[in-house]
């Protein structure tokens, strides 16, 4: 349908990756670590889907900047993982705060959710980065230059 060089194909791959990853991971964090009710978390994820659709491709380009910088520093895998973590945390945390405010989470819940998300992102390594790489391959995004770990 779209050529492998299509920017739309790239945007669709990035959007798919972000919606799926953020829905699963953040719901687990909100319910099991932050003390939000299932209903609050469900509504948070519903609000997050259109937000994730809007920010997915800009985030993908933002992450690609971190990957290019990491490649210049070192070809090692731990630099790529660190760049993935920094890109994710610095881009997603402010967006996550806004989503939680919209759904009525209080400041204690917001701080718990965002800080837990940061810690989980660090503990999980660069899982989202690997998932994004996988989705880009799945959608056959040809212009994408993967940094090998």
Curated annotation (Swiss-Prot):
Transmembrane stretches, start-end: 16-36, 46-66, 85-105, 112-132
Membrane topology according to the record: Multi-pass membrane protein
GO biological processes: amino acid export across plasma membrane; cellular response to stress; L-alanine transport
GO CC terms: plasma membrane
Superkingdom classification of source: Bacteria
Swiss-Prot/TrEMBL keywords: Amino-acid transport, Cell inner membrane, Cell membrane, Membrane, Transmembrane, Transmembrane helix, Transport
Compartments where located: Cell inner membrane
Signals that turn on the gene: Induced in the presence of L-alanyl-L-alanine dipeptides.
Knocked-out gene: effects: Mutants show a significant accumulation of intracellular L-alanine and a reduction in the L-alanine export rate.
GO molecular function terms attached to this record: L-amino acid efflux transmembrane transporter activity
Record-annotated disulphide pairs: none
InterPro entries on file: Ala_export_AlaE (IPR010574)
Function in brief: Exports L-alanine.
UniProt protein name: L-alanine exporter AlaE
Organism: Escherichia coli (strain K12)
Gene for this chain: alaE
């Amino acid at each position: 349908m779209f050529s492998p060089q299509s920017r739309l194909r790239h945007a669709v791959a990035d959007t798919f990756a972000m919606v799926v990853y953020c829905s699963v991971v953040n719901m687990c964090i909100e319910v099991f670590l932050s003390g939000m009710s299932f209903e609050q978390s469900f509504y948070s994820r519903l609000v997050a889907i259109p937000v994730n659709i809007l920010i997915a491709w800009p985030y993908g380009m933002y992450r690609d900047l971190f990957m290019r910088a990491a490649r210049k520093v070192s070809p090692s895998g731990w630099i790529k993982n660190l760049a993935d973590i920094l890109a994710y945390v610095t881009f997603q945390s402010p967006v996550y705060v806004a989503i939680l405010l919209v759904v009525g989470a209080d400041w204690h819940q917001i701080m718990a959710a965002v800080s837990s998300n940061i810690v989980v992102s660090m503990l999980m390594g660069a899982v989202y980065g690997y998932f994004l790489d996988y989705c880009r391959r799945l959608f056959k995004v040809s212009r994408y230059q993967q940094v090998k770990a």
